[in-house]
């Protein structure tokens, strides 16, 4: 029975073990900091629950499973609402009070607007470390901070040294190398 499902079982094992192993290697780089490593919703269709579990096993944290898990105002929401302040006001009017409101920002003007409008979490998206440092100074503890976009093993220590609360990376699930696992040495046990 095992051999009839060998390829499928190995595909799952290789993929999920690769995610857990890669996540662990990135999480080790955060040791000694207060920064939490988050995954994203960039997962394989039908595999989200398993891939997010692999991230947790590897030492990362899950951001959101789906859109109902939290309010994340992205550029298209901000544009549709007419600006950062308007998007936050609309979210506060309609979201349950227990939900944090996170805003994706791309520049310092957006960061300032998000702080003034009372965002709970401000995502610094695709910013340079210098831009992130300035944004963190502007935020000055008035909101939690999350850095995302172009996060690599090579630059993650620089980013966490800025004092960010969270670093999110889609690479944990969409770019983790698959582990080479086989059933080559499998033996039948008698009895």
Predicted feature descriptions by range:
Residues 124:
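Active-site core of metal-dependent hydrolases
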């Amino acid at each position: 029975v095992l051999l009839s499902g060998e390829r499928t079982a190995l595909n799952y094992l290789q993929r999920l073990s690769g995610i857990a192993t890669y996540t662990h290697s990135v999480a080790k780089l955060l040791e000694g900091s207060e920064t939490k490593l988050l995954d994203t919703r960039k997962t394989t269709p039908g595999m989200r629950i398993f891939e997010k579990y692999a991230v947790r096993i590897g030492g990362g944290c899950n951001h959101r499973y789906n859109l109902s898990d939290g309010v994340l105002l992205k550029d298209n929401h901000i544009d549709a609402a007419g600006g950062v302040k308007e998007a936050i006001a609309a979210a506060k009017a309609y979201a349950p009070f227990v939900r944090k409101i996170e805003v994706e920002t791309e520049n310092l003007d957006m960061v300032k607007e998000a702080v003034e409008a009372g965002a709970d979490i401000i995502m610094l998206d695709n910013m340079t470390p210098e831009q992130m440092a300035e944004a963190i100074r502007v935020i000055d503890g008035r909101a939690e901070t999350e850095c995302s976009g172009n996060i690599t093993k090579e630059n993650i220590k620089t980013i966490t040294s800025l004092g960010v609360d969270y670093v999110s990376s889609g690479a944990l699930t969409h770019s983790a190398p698959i582990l080479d696992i086989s059933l080559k040495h499998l033996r039948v046990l008698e009895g």
